[in-house]
């Protein structure tokens, strides 16, 4: 999609192994005239997560954090732009949160960019340039308060790590199920797994639904199963799945 608006260089990829790992991004071949380096920090389809941010060699880092936002503490000073839809961990679909370094909020944008697609438009209008999705924002506020009551992002991270460990430990020991991501790059939010038999995968999803487990079918592009264990999923839910 980005190629519609400018030149794009793919600096690193794990396509060679079905995106089952995060490639080494410590010494990327970044062109001098690059405007920014972009990553999707957590891949919901393949279940991978950047545990270490790329070395952008001074270039601005832009990150889509839709599926890992507020799942753990983040040093925002390492980014130029952090953005994402709230529908995974914060609130209902239809709201987007963007955290932008102030020097990047300018009128210096691609020629032809519509007014309402400029960050500066919304920053200047305090996010009220057009009618905001008030109810969605209200729900986000309730979630923020809930997060604080849980002990903040440090406590949420600890709980998310505990949930993920329960599931990954089971998969690593199982003779039937197998995780699809190398251990060091595993997501805390999305856990894909397979049996190695498509018919058996389908049977598992069907039987799991009867047992009260919804949406365990993997993304249509990869198949298998996927357990999404976002902030709202209690530890008990993961324990029940393992049982």
PLM-predicted stretches and their roles:
Residues 176-180, 212-218:
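A short linear hydrophobic-aromatic micro-motif
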Residues 2, 14-69:
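Active-site phosphate-binding strand-loop segment of PLP-dependent enzymes
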Residues 10-13, 39, 61-65, 83-85, ...:
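General beta-strand structural signal in soluble alpha/beta enzymes
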Residues 210, 219-243:
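PLP-dependent enzyme catalytic core of the Aspartate aminotransferase-like
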